[in-house]
Amino acid sequence: MNRLKPVAIIKIDITNMSPLCGKTLIDIDFRSRYNCMVVGIEDDMGNLQVTEAQRKFQAGERIWVVGEEADLAMLKMGI
């Protein structure tokens, strides 16, 4: 029997220096590259929006990401 691996959700701040800033999920190939899924974008007012693949990430936003704990740890190191 296959055991499911634990998943978690984390919040990542997008800064001017972030490699995600100014790019879309498509540009980054986010799901394939990080094996995680962006489930929402929070603006500086705290409003949460559903992600669209063509929308560019902007400095000051936060993204909410779901994935296996090991993949999330690798994502945080790479950003």
Question: What is each model feature region?
Answer:
Residues K11, N16-I79:
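Cytosolic Rossmann-like ligand/nucleotide-binding regulatory domains
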